[in-house]
């Protein structure tokens, strides 16, 4: 069974937090500097919306069932990039996207904090053991390190993940109070598997990060291929809420109550993605049967490859007959 959660070594995390917290120097780039208050704390809540109703095709039910890896993120300046669409992923992110292994990615974050002084803090949240559910953490941002990036692996999958690339929580002279974003699947470009449970098949040469859509990759075998949809429903969402109190005295703010209410609405309004029936090609015609001198009948069959769901196109007839001249008549 695939290892769906990774163990983050406590000693390394303590070292990382201490090291990165002491390297809040000026960023090397020429980006505009945030003039908000020196520090801000946020709660981050990741909500999985990967349900069988919204994503019925090849939905993983066992070995392992649909779920999410731990969340791994960083608060940083523009000199650091955890991942970026249309660019190649690092070795660390490759390991995370393919196997959920975080060690190499954590070492890359550490190196960026030491050499470039571009990472202010790291944060993580526990894995979600089902396709739908929540996990949360807290993070700290700094005016010179106001960008946030994170990744969560889709489990099971070849190298698919969701995440945010360089979200700026600062807007001019103030910190944003709340940010809610829908998340969609991305392909890390390191494994060529088409389905959730595809065996390991390295992409050589490596490709860049691409967003997976209802029509791309344009192949019926792909687990996210829904040709009737213009776009996929969000597979997850993330909510950032600025915290007004110290972490020890933190109580869920009123915004959290609103978000819980939204979760109830979301659960009642889960999009029903139609899944059309798919059948095989016709078999060869069988032998023609019947008395000599009269018309006989022959038949051929096909079988269901994908059962329809959520009001998708029903399956056509699976057997067909035709008239014929009987075989072996002299």
Curated annotation (Swiss-Prot):
One of its GO terms (molecular function) is metal ion binding. GO terms for cellular component: extracellular matrix; extracellular space. Ca(2+) binds at residues 159, 187, 191. A divalent metal cation binds at residue 140. The gene is Spon2. Keywords: Calcium, Cell adhesion, Disulfide bond, Extracellular matrix, Glycoprotein, Immunity, Innate immunity, Metal-binding, Secreted, Signal. Cell adhesion protein that promotes adhesion and outgrowth of hippocampal embryonic neurons. Binds directly to bacteria and their components and functions as an opsonin for macrophage phagocytosis of bacteria. Essential in the initiation of the innate immune response and represents a unique pattern-recognition molecule in the ECM for microbial pathogens. It is found in: Secreted, Extracellular space, Extracellular matrix. Disulfide bonds join 34-170. It comes from the Eukaryota. Residues 276-330 form the TSP type-1 domain. This is Spondin-2. GO terms for biological process: cell adhesion; cellular response to lipopolysaccharide; cellular response to platelet-derived growth factor stimulus; defense response to bacterium; defense response to fungus; defense response to virus; induction of bacterial agglutination; innate immune response. SUPFAM superfamilies: TSP-1 type 1 repeat (SSF82895). Monomer. Interacts with integrin. Abundantly expressed in the developing hippocampus. Residues 30-220 form the Spondin domain. Residues 1-25 form the signal peptide. Its main location: secreted. Glycans are attached at residue 282. The record marks 140 as: Important for metal ion-dependent interaction with integrin.
């Amino acid at each position: 069974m695939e290892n769906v959660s990774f163990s983050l070594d406590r000693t390394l995390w303590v070292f990382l937090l201490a090291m990165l917290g002491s390297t809040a120097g000026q960023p090397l780039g020429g980006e505009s500097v945030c003039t908000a208050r020196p520090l801000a704390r946020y709660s981050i809540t990741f909500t999985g919306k990967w349900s069988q109703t919204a994503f019925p095709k090849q939905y993983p039910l066992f070995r392992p069932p649909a779920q999410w890896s731990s969340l791994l993120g960083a608060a940083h300046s523009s000199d650091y990039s955890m991942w970026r669409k249309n660019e190649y992923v690092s070795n660390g992110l490759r390991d995370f996207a393919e196997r959920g292994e975080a060690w190499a990615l954590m070492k890359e974050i550490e190196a960026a904090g030491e050499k470039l002084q571009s990472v202010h803090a790291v944060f993580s949240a526990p894995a979600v053991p089902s396709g739908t559910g929540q996990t949360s953490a807290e993070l700290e941002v700094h005016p010179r390190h106001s960008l946030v990036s994170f990744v969560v692996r889709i489990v099971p999958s070849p190298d698919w993940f969701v995440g945010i690339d360089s979200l700026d929580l600062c807007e001019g002279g103030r910190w944003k109070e709340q940010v809610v974003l829908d998340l969609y699947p991305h392909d890390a470009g390191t494994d060529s598997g088409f389905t959730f449970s595809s065996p390991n098949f390295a992409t050589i040469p490596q490709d860049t990060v691409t967003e997976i859509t209802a029509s791309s990759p344009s192949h019926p075998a792909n687990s996210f291929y829904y040709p009737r949809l213009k776009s996929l429903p969000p597979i997850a969402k993330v909510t950032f809420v600025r915290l007004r109190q110290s972490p020890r005295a933190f109580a869920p703010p009123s915004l959290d109550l609103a978000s819980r209410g939204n979760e109830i609405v979301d659960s009642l309004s889960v999009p029903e993605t139609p899944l059309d029936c798919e059948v095989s090609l016709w078999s060869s015609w069988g032998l023609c049967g019947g008395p000599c001198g009269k018309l006989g009948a022959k038949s051929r069959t096909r079988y269901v490859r994908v059962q329809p769901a959520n009001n998708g196109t029903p399956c056509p007839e699976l057997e067909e007959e035709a008239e014929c001249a009987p075989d072996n008549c002299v």
